Regions:
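Negatively charged, low-complexity tracts enriched in Asp/Glu with abundant Ser/Thr
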Residues: 2-29
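Acidic surface patches and DE-rich sequence motifs
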Residues: 11, 48, 87-89
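Feature captures hydrophobic
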Residues: 24-28, 52-58
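A short beta-strand micro-motif
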Residues: 40-49
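Acidic, low-complexity, intrinsically disordered interaction modules
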Residues: 54-88
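Tryptophan-centered short beta-strand motifs
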Residues: 91-95
Length: 95
């Protein structure tokens, strides 16, 4: 896998809470991980079905990613997230 994501922040009832970074997917390659640690990547936020922001982070995509990977790999199972937004063209857009 040549893509990778990093959860940089978690939220509880919309309030920031401290967390250690979480990297994915399992088996993430060194290249994407190093780029994430250099603060590269596409910014995203994940939300639950009540519209509460649950986590945010960055994605290093490859030619095969759909950009749903952080949601599918981590957000749904760990936070109950149902949608993801990316920073595009000066604003947050639902994917």
């Amino acid at each position: 896998m040549a893509y990778g994501w990093k959860i940089t922040s978690e939220y509880d009832n919309g309030e920031f809470k401290e967390c250690s970074p979480v990297y994915g997917p399992s088996g993430i390659k060194d290249g994407p991980r190093q780029r994430l640690d250099a603060d590269e990547g596409l910014r995203f936020k994940m939300y639950d079905d009540d519209g509460e922001k649950m986590a945010s982070g960055k994605l290093i995509p490859d030619d095969h990613t759909t950009q749903f990977e952080p949601l599918d790999d981590y957000g749904e199972g760990n936070f109950g997230c149902t949608y993801i937004k990316y920073w595009q063209d000066g604003g947050w857009k639902i994917l």
